[in-house]
């Protein structure tokens, strides 16, 4: 084992970029090559079936089962032309990954042979075993039946030889067991609520679409080095490891030249992603060494979520091909930035109006203010719930550190919009207003044209920032399913818009002019949601004190934050918006607490194993070597001179002894804390026990191990060090 680290380091240095064959046509020509999109539908489906299916996708009408067989036949024909032999219902259970079971296109022909078959029934509905997925007690082990049902709004795609059909996943009794079902409900409710409010300004609007543009951050680690780090393999993060002397302090990695091997990986990934219809746009180095980002063009929210889940799976496949492992954990390395997934969220009407963008007329700008303020109302009322939606055992490592948004939800608007809302709040009732357009900025450099400066700056410490025509939810974790946070955001804003319309209509019913009524309610809401607006430094201690005074949720314990899902206001909001029932919320919380416990439990077990089987043996081996050196020196030089010459080694021997003893006691205490926690029956209380008693002991052990790493001879240390993991590319 002593030489394994050096073997894998040498192996990593030998690796060269994998050659990637670039398609000989433009990206636009192979985009969505393996997606059953509208062009394929038009080609492979009868015209009447095509029209009905498009109506389902565009207008949300119920799928007519009578066309299912024709759709399935067209899909099968297209799939077989692409070498497909199997199909699967592809869904997103509460594991935060995806799930699939592959079935072949074969049935008995009744004559002792087989025929290829794929019916509408198989396309529309399947029955996976629901008892083996996280369900929070909704299903007992002996109650295995669950249903997966086709989501026609997200196109079918091909991976290898399998036709993948995006589906929802529900229990036998109808409760959602996935992320997609409540996401679709939230999108439907938000569209209805936003459309009703739009009718004050644009009577012809029929629906409002929610758009999402995510920014996926990730780390790449050489596969050889990864294989020599059991903690990375089993938990997704390093449980020990001293900082590299150089990490990100020079700011030289962000937007730097992309390393050759990484560039080959990115190129391969983008080609395959484009073929699957994922509109990749941007790639670059991130702040930390070996950290990178990929971002697509924004899409309709449901499709964007599916594409993000598909991309994370694809990244792992492509990374392996290039001799890398992709790390999606929010904090794989201590001492350098973790990874997030900014969610750029916006609303757009079917007539092309961006509802969070300012317009050119007073009417447009009043609409703009209404949607800004009602979004803030939803975020303010449910700020604790929004925090719960992005909280996890992994993301908790990142939030609140001086690298990511704090664990207090607030919204940054920028000076101009803040001044505007303050002006409306204090202005005379009938005063009209208009927002200025972008202002030019002369750079005094002849070769550079005038820049058009946005009316909003950026505040990287803000979890929910307005960025010109959208809001950027920055607290979402890198390995999370975006749907978790968007379900809450969509439902909260839908509720706010519904409440807004109810109050405006009440004033109109009393005889007040529509514009006057809208301004009255907007001014009232500007005052109400003012505590959520914060343009300062979210990292400061002063903000934590101020947030408490404002009544914002400042709880930092992950298991306790999950309680927000079961607050009366949350249950009522989800019920009113028809997004989730109380039983679904309770079940999901059970899953969240159980998942939190299991992740910390696994980390604790891995740490105990590595400590006793790697760290302690290596440290004591080095200690013994030093002891022999001391003994030999004293024999050669005699008493006083020998003691003087060996004083440094004796000091190291003593420090190793003290630290290993502390570590061994720490591991024993860690095991005992786990035993106590494991006896707790309540999933909530067990998760809290793991948070309060188990996780802190791991940090104490890590501190001692990282100190030992600096003491023990480099040639003996068996685990690849941070400098190797972060700088070998």
Where are the language model's segments positioned?
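Active-site proximal loops enriched in glycine and acidic residues that flank catalytic Cys/His/Asp
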Residues: 67, 91, 119, 296-298, ...
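N-terminal hydrophobic targeting/anchoring segments and the immediately downstream early-domain regions
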Residues: 2-24, 141-155, 162
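C-terminal amphipathic alpha-helical interaction region
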Residues: 524-729
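Active-site core of metal-dependent hydrolases
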Residues: 30-143
